[in-house]
């Protein structure tokens, strides 16, 4: 996770990950929350969009993230919750509806997920860069292979879908 950029971020878009049924964040979600808190302190004027709906047996990811960010000292007036998003594309479409085109945003998510999120936010017309929440331990070859095989088709699918939605005027940009 690197925060060295001097470029301004007007919005921080935090992509969700399932919470535990009792409302506590999973380790993956906790890393994203910690990275978002660091980014919020780095860019104190930036607003945060936390995104993610409820799971089958867990509360909305956005609510869990917002509560934890407030516990990290991030003001509630800076946090916008999107509790309807079911996946990455839903989060990007919510960002495109809320944030004006050309706005500088930082996508906070897991490191393996950054390329897809940044590409989609850029297709949505936002000036995006990513901040990957690093794992607490090394992923290893099996983990790397799993996430690579998972993300490659997802990137291809989502990019094609985003380009089609944009061409049809249905991407939702502000």
Feature-to-residue mapping (PLM):
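Active-site cores that bind ATP or allylic diphosphates and position pyrophosphate for catalysis
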Residues: 174
């Amino acid at each position: 996770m690197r925060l060295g950029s001097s470029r301004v971020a007007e919005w921080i878009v935090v992509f969700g990950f399932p919470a535990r049924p009792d409302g506590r964040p999973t380790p993956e979600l906790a890393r994203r929350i910690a990275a978002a808190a660091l980014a919020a302190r780095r860019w104190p004027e930036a607003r945060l969009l936390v995104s993610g709906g409820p799971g089958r047996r867990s509360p909305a990811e956005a609510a869990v993230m917002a509560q934890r960010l407030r516990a990290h000292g991030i003001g509630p007036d800076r946090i916008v919750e999107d509790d309807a998003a079911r996946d990455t594309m839903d989060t990007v479409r919510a960002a495109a509806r809320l944030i004006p085109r050309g706005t500088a945003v930082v996508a906070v998510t897991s490191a393996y997920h950054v390329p897809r999120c940044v590409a989609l936010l850029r297709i949505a017309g936002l000036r995006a860069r990513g901040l990957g929440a690093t794992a607490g331990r090394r992923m290893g070859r099996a983990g790397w292979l799993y996430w690579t095989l998972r993300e490659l088709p997802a990137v291809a699918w989502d990019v094609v879908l985003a380009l089609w939605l944009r061409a049809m005027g249905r991407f939702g940009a502000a």
